[in-house]
Amino acid sequence: MSNESSQLAASSRLPTTTNQVKTVITDTPFVSTALEERRSRSLRARPSLSSPSMGIPSTTHPNGHATQSKGMEAISQGLRQEAVIVRREKRITEKERELKEVVESHDGLIREKFHLERFVTLLEGWNPEQAKLDNSPVFLQWKDSKHNLLNLLPDEPAISASSQAGPSRPRSSLPSRTTRRKAHEQSELLAHVVAPVAKPPAFAPSTKGKERVGDELHAKTKGKGKGLAEQSLIPSPAEGALHTKGGKRKVGDVTTDMLPPPVPDKRSRGSRRATMGAPLPQIDQNEEVGLDSQATHGGKAKRRGRISLPDLPTSKKLRTAKRASAVSSESASPVVEAPTLERLASPSPLSTPVPLPTFAHLPFPPAPHRIRKRIVGPRTIRYTDPSQRPPAPKYGGDITPIIESYVNINDTGPPPEMKTLEARAKKEGYLLARVMYLKSHGRLQRLVDEEDGSNLFSTTTTSNSHAKIIRIPPRKTDYHDTLIAHMVQVRNAMLNVAKSKPVTCKKVARMVQAYWENIEGKEERERLAEEKERRRMGKEIIKSLRKRWALAVKVVRAKILEAQKQEQDRLGKEHLQNILQRSTGLLEAQIQGSNDSGEEEGEDSTSDNTDDSEGDDETNTLLPLTSISPEPVIGDDEEDVDVHDDDDEQQGEEDTSHKEDESDASDTESDENSMSEHNQDLRFLISDDVLNEDPMSTGRFAEEDRGSSDTEQLTDNKNDGEEPKETAVQAAFDGSDDVNRLEEPHNPVSSTANIGNFALLESSSAEVSDASCPATMPILVRQSPKTCSQPRTRKVKLSTLSLSSDPDPDINDPEFKARLEDSNQDDQDEELDLEMEEADSAGRESGEGNRDSEDEGLLADADLPIEVLLRRYGYPVPEGEGAVNGEPEQSESKGREQAAPTSTVSETLPSTKLSLAQPANQTDQSLTDTALPEPRVPEQLIISGKRQRRKKEIWTPDDSEPQHLVGKKRIKKVEIVEKVEADVHQNGDGLVIVEEETMGDEDNDDSKVGQEEEDGHEYDSEEEYDEDEDEEEEGAKEDNVDWDDRQDKEGDIGPRVRQPFLLRGTLRPYQQAGLEWLASLWSNNMNGILADEMGLGKTIQTIALLGHLACDKGVWGQHLIIVPTSVILNWEMEFKKFLPGMKVLTYYGNQKERKEKRVGWHTENTWQVCITSYQIVLADQHIFRRKNWCYMILDEAHNIKNFRSQRWQTLLGFKAQRRLLLTGTPLQNNLMELWSLLYFLMPGGIGADATAVVGFANHKEFMEWFSNPMDKAIETGDAMDEETLETVAKLHTLLRPFILRRLKSEVETQLPGKFEHVVYCRLSKRQRFLYDEFMSRASTHEALTTGGYLGVMNTLMQLRKVCNHPDLFEMRPVKTSFAMDNVARDFEPSDILIRKRLLAEEDERRIDALAIGFGVAHNEAMSGWVARARQTYDASDKLPYAASPLRRGKLSAPPPKDTRSVELWLKYRVWAEEEFSKRRWESIRATNRQRCGISPIYGSTFLSLLGNLPNFLLPQDVQSRREETFADFTPPAAKFITSLPERAKSLEDVIDRFAVIPPNAVARNLATYALPGLEPISHPALTDPAFDTLHRSSVKLQIAFPDASLLQYDCGKLQKLFEMLRDLKSEGHRVLIFTQMTRVLDILEMFLSHNGHRYLRLDGSTKIEDRQVLTERFNSDSRIFVFIASSRSGGVGINLTGADTVFFYDSDWNPSMDRQCMDRAHRIGQTREVHIYRFVSSHTVEENMLRKAEQKRLLDKMVIQEGGFNNDWWGRVGWKDMFGDVPGITDVSGVVEKSGEGIIDIQVEGTPVAEDVEVTRPRAGEERELARALAEVEDEEDAQAARMAQGEGELDLQEFEEGPKAVAKRVRVFEPENSGTPVTTEAGETGDVVEEYDDEPGSVEEYMLKWVEEDWDYFSPYRA
């Protein structure tokens, strides 16, 4: 526990003498004033003086001892106990009253705040008296928690019982120990809490000098429990010490206590010194700490810390009992007012202050004893200078008169008594004595300004501190001081000499020792150096060995990489061969399908009418019963996969039974080879697990056993009633025969790929149950016309078979997951799914009872005539149904009665329809060599692109006997017959594939009749139904003939695929052929690219395809069409115009509109076709990914030519059964763009086995196979070698099944021709100068040499500007003359100007020419007789005061101006008024006389007479004054007199020709100098341009504009264009001009206006609604001669067939853009031949651009056009010749030598000329970089037009522009990979070394290489 705290606690219980001392001191006026001044300072609590020996120091006055004794006596008299008690009671009463007022005021404010916060004032109003009565618990709790003054102090912790108690306080009052620092900190905090004063934050010194006390209430300490002691010092307010034992513990007045002083900041040197900041070691802490307690309690008190002052250093004096007893009656320091612990424990202001001890108890300590060495004897002070004498004391050493004369201003009352003044003086003297005592001991150094800040915290002695307080006055040095200083210097020199000698000796000794040590350790050092050298050599050897081994590893690695490369090349070649074989097989299937369709239809039209006729609109579909799910709800993918795996096993069994039953049923084939030949044409359509399965395998028997059990189950269920029949009927309407293929996204760049995933679309029906249908029983489904026109709502479950364990391509996509989680739309979709599922389930429940009625309705429909059914379901009724080819209908009916009711599929299903899904662990072998067809073409079983036939019978389980195949002689077809026999032991699935032979035997007829008898009436109704269908088919067979025979025999025979009846309008022949090709893609499960040239109707063909699928296939969607934003509405209008039966959803708009359009998104019949844009499909990709699209169609598919774009990657992940790309330019820049399109169609890739080909080639393989060789061949321009021709042929073979491209010249015979010409134009003189000057610039040379791409493109753009027009590069300047104001006049001194101005104004003011009569000619407008008459009538003399009266004598003096009397003032006023009137009338009379006396010199009459002479000469346009005079006579010379305007007009040509060169400098304001004094602004006529005749010539000489004709003559292209436009206009042609730059359009506008041609303009700034108006106006108005447009905005989407001549002012890098511009005029609707002229500046960069464009055209010609990707190719080239020699590209031996100017014709549709020029191979992806660089360097207008065009054509293309990093990455990817080993230069050198040691067998290198090869697993991870 703290000793100081205990002593302070005990001080409150001292005798009353102590309290009296304190009270007297406090109440003394002077002392109280001093206390008030020092209340902001906190001094430590200390005892009072008890010894009178310690008085006031005598340094202030010689008589200080006498004054001190008198003051002490006065103080002693005032310290009586009675006076102290009276003053104390009075003070207590006052403080209690003040405290009560404070508490009442505080309580009132708190209550008002409570009412405001609780809004009580607003309800009841504020009443202070009523608020005082509010003592509710809520208020008391709120007041206690927030505004209780007692809570401001921290709680006092519990004091342990074991704490020691000091002699001055109880044991339980305070903690065990408190240091001075802690006590001081607590005193500071308590002082701020009890009496807060606005003080800046201060820092109190701590033990380490770095603790910051400041504003922190709880300082953190690191001592032994000091933190706890600090917290325990502050007592709890709840413990309040007001009522203590015996009432002795009282707390003094807070307001009278001295506040803690601000702690100084140690960082500020200029601040005051901290209290006790320099602790003095001479003060014994025993004296300072425990004197009071020892005196009171017998010297047994412990040391206590000081509260308000920091720690003092402990004195080194011994603390003995004797010392303690000796000073027991002494005190360390007097007590100063400060908050004590008693006050803290009892914060109540009602307590009495702690009394101060008396002087007797607390004497001053003696002065510290200092031992000083002094000079013995008296010291004589000698002054060597008068200034050294001390100054005389002020005021004569006596300040009594000054004190007596002191008067206090505040003392307004009577002067105090002498006793009161003496008491005050005693108190103040006491305080001053204490202060001086403390200063002498260094205790109050903080109150002293210290000049030297460096000694702020220094620990100096007491004498030094005292010396700083009482400074010795400065004096000058004398002789004695100099002598002492010299002695000090000599002494220092002697010491230095004494120190230097040992140092020198040590240096010498050290050198000798080093010498001997060097000799002694020489051998050891040499040994260590040798050892170090050996280690170094060993490390070098090891390093060289490692390097050698690393070299060996590199060589072996290079060999292995080379072997891997060779193996990869081999596998790649095999892969390419497999891909080519697959393409061949697919194309073979298409060709044979078309041929078979033609043959079949031809035979049908000429064969006997007794043949069974199948319907055109109903199809037979064989589906296992397990594929019909009883609950058709889209569930989890895992469940789908499990179900599908079961289907795979069952279908595998069925395929095995197909083969065996077919072998048994065939009469013409007896061995397996024959069967293999018969079925080899189905290898591309049937899975390889069926083709390659061994019939004798054990697995087959196991499956047969299971099939047998299934057959038994089927037999058992035969007698269950009509349930199987009902199931078949329901399946006929709800089933689907489509087998869908889902393509999952695949990494195109990866070298490995998964096997393609096929999905089987399973038919699901709510009415079919597993209990009533066997698991493996197949059923025949008939699809009625109702299914086509009114499709039923059904759920389709997709099961994906893939090698991947994840069937969903988006299931592992984190971005897709995040979007699904964050998307609110997905939650709505899920809710919609649940609602729709509930609706479907409810429909299924309600439909269970209506099943029988529906079946009866279907059977009733079978009895209706075919005409009624056709009308009911929307089919047109054909004419001529009764007979075909002249045969009666009865014969046909008779033949149908003889036909067997077999289950026949007349049209072979597509590849995936008949193919059974292969297991996930098997590899597709359908495209291997063993699966390829033989060269011999057997009778085909594939009918591709033909309409499906209607099944005429439905099989029922009532058939107990096996069905036999009967029929007439027709082409062989595949018939799938359901065979149910109980005793069949070969297989049990009942599926037999047999070949239908010639029909004519009686046995077959008999068997058929027997079968009909068993079937009963059901077959009768079906036969009647089929008769009507046969009639319809016979009527339609007239149009169904072979497509190839149409061109040779009849031109009006119907197509294979009929035009959908929902399609309005008639397709053109080539459009019908395109529809058939698209239908064949669907039938063969293929994707394709419709790449017809622009203007051939790709949109209508696509719409027709969707109509065909809906009408003929029953596939209504849903389809997704992605188009550019600008043509969304165009597609919608095309659908409404040609196919209004399809429900179309145009998905566009903002987010809210799209959300509204997604209402019913999952409802099947809400819409069938969704049309959206590329931008929206990316924004809502998470919505589109979730749907399984039937057909995904991409318009303008070249938008996905970049496989790195987000658009390509996003669309690749969509689920779609089929994909179709529409583009007019499938190949624009390079082959890799074509690869992007093809890979998008076939994203399968390569599997683990190179022979398992299920998809397309990856990026690297395609580049190595095709891109690199063909690019090299195109760029070199040499003749095609055999290898290149073979590569081209392979590429054609690869692309032919997937691309259909027709040119307008091929399909539109009536379309006029198109001819292209290149016009070479010479550069003008100015163009050549600018071109050469730009090329010779250093900056241009630097840009070309450094190779910076942007710099090169900027150079290219500037050169193109020069070639187009020099004004684009540098405008002709408008020349003006240099003109400025007079410089000398502007710089004249201001004072001269001021003087001139003042003088001018003075002259004008003083001199008035008119007033003095100097205006001689001013009155010439007046007539003479008027002036004379005016003088006659002058009446000036008649005015008042005109005649002055005669006066005699002197004039009377004027009266004086006297204001003292009224009479004199009135007299003066009368006189003044009279004088003023006289002067006024005199002025009026003089003015009147002057005005009446004015007269002209000649007069207007005389001048008019002289001006009207009849003989003067004037111009004819001047109006004469006397017209009657001129009518009499006109001078003969008058016509030669011209006016000034006429003269200026006649000289306009001369002025225009010669006033063209303005002078270099001209002078201004010549009129001012020529006519000084004439201000033009005062005469408006002078500023009128009509008045200024020389205005035109002056302006021509001031500014010179370029001549308008220079616009044409400065440019060679415009000169040529002027000539050609003149000729074309005379011949009646109309012109279309395209350019890339918007500024060129401005120049063309000026050019056309200058030459008088009418034109229209269209650029990027033209609004979309105005474009259609412009095009229609140009096409309809033949007066408009020219239409100018930018190629970027006018090249897409407009029709300009009114023009027959197209000019390309500049060429584009991409030739496909120019072709699009050409097609604006050369399209359907053009009636004249179209000529295209391309302007090229000779000997410029444009020639190289044209050459590069020709290379791209050549590449497109070789790859696309010569490939023959059209329908005619099938007729020209047989399918056997697909691998034959393909005619190569014609080699052009020579190139026409271009002259400087001329026109060269180019064969537009032929092969472009490959010029033999040396051109470096362009970087891959150059076109995109080029377009971006051109956009950066071209003009702002062109860039703006390009952006707007891009937004119209490709609205969202700019979002997928790749940055520089992506471009650099793309360049690295596109760089051709080296075919050699990737060995560095060092590896190459190693190869030479190996060859060098080849002649030495067994060399080290061979050994190392052999070792590395043998143990390659160990060396493979090693890297040098």
Swiss-Prot record:
The enzyme's E.C. designation: 3.6.4.12
Domain HSA: 467-540
Family annotation (SUPFAM superfamilies): P-loop containing nucleoside triphosphate hydrolases
Compositional bias (Basic and acidic residues): 208-219, 701-726, 841-852, 1037-1055
The keyword Transcription regulation is annotated on this UniProt entry: yes
Bias kind Polar residues: ranges: 1-31, 56-68, 900-929
Alphabetized Gene3D superfamilies for the sequence: P-loop containing nucleotide triphosphate hydrolases (3.40.50.300), SWI2/SNF2 ATPases, N-terminal domain (1.20.120.850), Tandem AAA-ATPase domain (3.40.50.10810)
Motif DEAH box boundaries: 1195-1198
Domain Helicase ATP-binding: residue ranges: 1079-1244
GO cellular component, one term: Swr1 complex
Subcellular location: Nucleus
GO molecular function: ATP binding; ATP hydrolysis activity; DNA binding; helicase activity; histone binding
Subunit architecture: Component of the SWR1 chromatin-remodeling complex.
Function noted in UniProt: Catalytic component of the SWR1 complex which mediates the ATP-dependent exchange of histone H2A for the H2A variant HZT1 leading to transcriptional regulation of selected genes by chromatin remodeling.
PANTHER family: HELICASE SRCAP, HELICASE SRCAP-RELATED
Protein name per Swiss-Prot or TrEMBL: Helicase SWR1
Organism: Cryptococcus neoformans var. neoformans serotype D (strain JEC21 / ATCC MYA-565) (Filobasidiella neoformans)
Gene: SWR1
